């Protein structure tokens, strides 16, 4: 394996680690209210794109300096040897390898866009613009925050609406930008994939889904008798649902991580966070005959302002008056720039046809001896993620506590 491939593998491992750290923080009962505290308390389903957030913060790092850049690299990159340049190289490879649309070739439809909206009184530093446009394929827009902030917010929202095929209509809520805003860095991600093996809608039946509080609801469950990629362990079952492939090497799949315990969701999220290779070691590699199979249909729309959550993870300087973002714009005003907020929204829908989604260790694991058939009954809270299997890049992650929400 050459150095570039090795670097990419290491970068992907850290992107996955970042994904699971965020997922654990969002699913924690102690989650900050501004970062979906209701979700942490078990009150709502969660879906977000760690890849979208990773790219947004990496672009901030392109204009950061000193300790601010170091904090960003520490959270996003390789501890001890990561660099901002490494983040940009990773972003460039992800945009080219993972986020290229494969629908013309018969695979999932993938759309991704980066945007830099800068006040017309300022100009981007050449070094920052070169990275933003060259590595991140960002569009740059000169706008008037100082006298037309509401119109600019509407412009950004329309851009996100277009990229996500109308699934996310508003990334910037009313009042989120004003005359003091100088720069908005945004990205949007859209994914729509059809299952390799679609579910028969006539077999979808209502069944009981048990909630974290012990109550239950009636929800529509998809069912099948076909063989499935499924691995079974003492406290966990992992289901892999592949999407139809295009003619390239990429293979997108959804993974359902179902804890054995009805209330095992939070401890599973914590386990993924504490053991970065936990998932990789449990990915199903062979199809097995299933006995009883039930998977609920679900649709999640989830948004949050991420700065408080990121501060908990140690990223504080970019959001403070001590931020060093002097590499973004060529103006004396650059010394006063900081990230006031980081908005994120995601949408994920799973049904019989497939998925539509948008966003703006060394331990040996032994496989439990599989019986002749394996049941997979997702009738209680579970984690899910959408991943590109060739690279291991996680596009979306979330949890379902109630499929009716």
From Swiss-Prot:
The record marks 368-369 as: Reactive bond. InterPro entries: Serpin_CS, Serpin_dom, Serpin_fam, Serpin_sf, Serpin_sf_1, Serpin_sf_2. Residues 354-378 are annotated as: RCL. One of its GO terms (molecular function) is serine-type endopeptidase inhibitor activity. It holds the Pfam family Serpin. Keywords: Protease inhibitor, Serine protease inhibitor. SMART domains: SERPIN. It comes from the Eukaryota. This is Serpin-ZXB. It comes from Oryza sativa subsp. japonica (Rice). The lineage of its organism: Eukaryota, Viridiplantae, Streptophyta, Embryophyta, Tracheophyta.
């Amino acid at each position: 394996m050459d150095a570039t491939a090795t670097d990419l593998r290491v970068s992907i491992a850290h992107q996955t680690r970042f994904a699971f750290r965020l997922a654990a923080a969002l699913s924690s009962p102690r989650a900050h209210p501004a970062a979906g505290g209701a979700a942490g308390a078990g009150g709502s389903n969660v879906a977000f794109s760690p890849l979208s957030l990773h790219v947004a913060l990496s672009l901030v790092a392109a204009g950061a300096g000193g300790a601010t850049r170091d904090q960003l690299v520490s959270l996003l990159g390789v501890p001890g040897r990561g660099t901002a340049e490494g983040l940009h190289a990773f972003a460039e490879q992800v945009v080219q390898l993972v986020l290229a649309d494969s629908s013309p070739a018969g695979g999932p439809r993938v759309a991704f866009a980066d945007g830099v909206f800068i006040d017309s009184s300022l100009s981007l530093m050449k070094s920052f613009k070169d990275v933003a446009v060259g590595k991140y394929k960002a569009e740059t827009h000169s706008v008037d925050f100082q006298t037309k902030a509401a119109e600019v917010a509407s412009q950004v929202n329309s851009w996100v609406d277009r990229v996500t095929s109308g699934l996310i209509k508003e990334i910037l809520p009313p009042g989120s930008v004003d005359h003091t805003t100088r720069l908005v860095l945004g990205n949007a991600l859209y994914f729509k994939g059809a299952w390799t093996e679609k579910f028969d809608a006539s077999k979808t039946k209502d069944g009981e889904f048990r909630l974290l509080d012990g109550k239950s609801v009636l929800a529509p469950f998809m069912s099948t008798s076909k063989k499935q990629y499924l691995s079974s362990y003492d406290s966990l079952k992992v289901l892999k649902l592949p999407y139809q492939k295009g003619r390239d090497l990429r293979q997108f799949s959804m993974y359902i991580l179902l804890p054995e315990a009805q209330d095992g969701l939070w401890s599973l999220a914590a386990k993924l966070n504490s053991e970065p290779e936990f998932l990789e070691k449990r990915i199903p590699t062979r199809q097995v005959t299933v006995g009883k199979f039930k998977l609920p249909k679900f649709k999640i729309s989830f948004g949050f302002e991420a700065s408080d959550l990121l501060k908990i993870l140690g990223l504080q300087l970019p959001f403070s008056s001590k931020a060093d973002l002097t590499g973004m714009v060529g103006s004396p005003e650059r010394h006063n720039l900081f990230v006031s907020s980081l908005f994120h929204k995601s949408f994920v829908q799973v049904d019989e046809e497939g998925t539509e989604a948008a966003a703006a260790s060394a331990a040996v694991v032994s496989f439990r001896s599989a019986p002749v058939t394996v049941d997979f009954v997702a009738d209680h809270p579970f984690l899910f993620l959408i991943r590109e299997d060739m690279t291991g890049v996680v596009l979306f992650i979330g949890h379902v506590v109630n499929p009716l929400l």
